[in-house]
Amino acid sequence: MYNNNNNFGGGGYNQGGGYNSGGYNNNGGGYNNNNGGYNNNNNNNGGYNNNRPQQQQQQQQQYVNNNNNSFDNNGYGGDDDVTNNSDYQSTTRNIQQIQNAVQILTKLVQLLGTPKDSMDTREKIRNCVDSTTHLISSESGKVKNLTSLASRSRDSKNKLLYQKLVKEFNNCLQQFKDIAQVATKKEKTTPLPVAPDHQQPTTFGRNNNSNNNNQNNHFLNNQQPYYDDDNREDEHQSLMESSRRQQLAQIEAEREYQNSIIQERDEGIRKIEQSIVEINEIFVDLSGLVAEQGVMINTIEASLESTTINTKEGVNHLREASKNQKSSRNKMCWIVLILLIVCAVLGVILFFTLRK
């Protein structure tokens, strides 16, 4: 780097030029630039010394890089195209995903309580709510960052783009929260669907019991005469007791199955309610930011409209001024021409008068 030392004293002047890897150094009101940092040293026997640390400059530059060069180190707009911002692009994509999830969830909720209702349908509802909630939670930090960038931007267009995107994201949250609440309410009020693969064994078991009873009765009725009535009665009671135990076992299995279904439903409803609470917290947080920026949006839009109107009025005034200027120019030309003609006539008259 360039090193220039200027020393003033005793009426003399001394200039030394050289190269210094530390940067450009000018003592007595000079400038020192070290590795991208800015250091201004003014020391002139009673002057002042202003040192700005290099670390502060590096931190500010790192902040700029983290925000995709959309804003300079003072936090104001440095990139005209806000769509190049990574958070802006990510939020735009995820808004579309949330809207798709709302449509899918709406169709699934409409199936609850209908013949097409099934445990698989309810499982899809829970998975959709859970995955979308995670998406919203991970995206909320980026949306807050966009709100912060919008408040720092000096460009009115950039500010509007950021704030409208945040508002659109908040609207998607409201729609998703509403349909999730509807899903919870319908799951609580509609009866549980019975799985077809569970109905079949029960019916089959009952048919088997009926067939067994018929076979047993037929067997008892066709016994040989040498069996006495007591033995026949004991065997009949034994068969009836066996059939009763099978029925009790089937009833107990049915009860356990229903309990497991109820527990699964309650667990799914609880998860959906937790997701609603989480989404509501994010919604309230972002709503406050949107409300704070809403006045600014209206002010900016009003300012843009006022600027447009003023610009049109200014153009009209310029046109009128241009017309007036041309008219004045024409009038001046005519006046000058008339004066020249008058002067020429007077000159001719004066010429002939003097000749006489």
Curated annotation (Swiss-Prot):
Q: Which GO terms describe its biological process?
A: endosome to lysosome transport; hypotonic response; intracellular protein transport; vesicle docking; vesicle fusion; vesicle-mediated transport
Q: From which domain of life does this come?
A: Eukaryota
- Identify the main location: membrane
In this entry, the parts of the chain located on the Cytoplasmic side of the membrane are 1-333
Where is there biased composition of kind Basic and acidic residues? 233-244
Q: Where is the t-SNARE coiled-coil homology domain?
A: 259-321
> What compartments host this protein?
Endosome membrane
Q: Name one Pfam family in it.
A: Syntaxin_2
Any one Gene Ontology MF annotation carried by this entry is: SNAP receptor activity
Q: Which InterPro entries match?
A: SNARE, Syntaxin, Syntaxin/epimorphin_CS, Syntaxin_N, T_SNARE_dom
Q: Name one GO cellular component term.
A: endosome membrane
The record's region (Disordered) falls at 32-88, 187-247
Record membrane topology: Single-pass membrane protein
User: Which SMART domains has this protein been placed in?
Assistant: t_SNARE
Subunit and partners: Component of the SNARE complex composed of syn7A, syn8A, vamp7A and vti1A. Interacts with nsfA, snpA and snpC.
Reported function: Involved in the targeting and/or fusion of transport vesicles to their target membrane during transport of proteins from the early endosome to the lysosome. Required for fusion of late endosomes with lysosomes and homotypic lysosomal fusion. May be involved in protein trafficking from the plasma membrane to the early endosome (EE) as well as in homotypic fusion of endocytic organelles.
Matching PANTHER family, A to Z?
A: LD27581P, SYNTAXIN
Question: What's this protein's name?
Answer: Syntaxin-7A
Q: Source species, please?
A: Dictyostelium discoideum
The lineage is: Eukaryota, Amoebozoa, Evosea, Eumycetozoa, Dictyostelia
Q: Which gene encodes it?
A: syn7A
